[in-house]
Amino acid sequence: MEISGEEWDQVLAVNVRGMLFCSQAVFPYMKQQQYGKIINISSSSIFKGSPHFLHYVTSKAGVVGFTRALAREVGTEGITVNAVAPGLTDSGANDQVSPAERFKKAIADRCIKRAEFPADLTGTVLFLASHHSDFMTGQLLNVDGGACMY
């Protein structure tokens, strides 16, 4: 609970407002061509919570609500909106906020007992970006090695 209002606002601004601005930027072009794919990134942490990351988990749950609401709003324009929920990913970018013990616990909680890397997400994102997902919208695909099942 030791999160400042400023830190809270910053995380929500990046993770929630950022989606709004990106979607607003591409919408006119997608509407004009009556086709488009918006793919948002959530987190599997929304299924089980994550202590000391209240602002992050809240913002990533917001991604799901945004995705579903926007899917309903722009579907008539031929635009699909979906989200991916990765688990704790060994990308190098989160080394400062995720100590080695946290990665070890993430691996232990998975059915697939190894680290998750950015490359583990590319197949899912490519599927969502392809014509193979043209009749799929408002969905969340969980890619975390089986740590969270819903």
Predicted regions and their residues:
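Active-site loop-to-helix junction immediately N-terminal to the catalytic Tyr of the SDR YXXXK motif
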Residues: 3, 49-57, 69
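A conserved structural motif in NAD(P)-dependent oxidoreductases
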Residues: 110-121, 132
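Alpha-helical segment proximal to the catalytic Tyr-Lys
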Residues: 28, 72-76, 134
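Short C-terminal tail/terminal secondary-structure segment
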Residues: 48, 125-126, 137-150
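Residue(s) in the substrate-gating loop at a strand-loop-helix junction
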Residues: 43
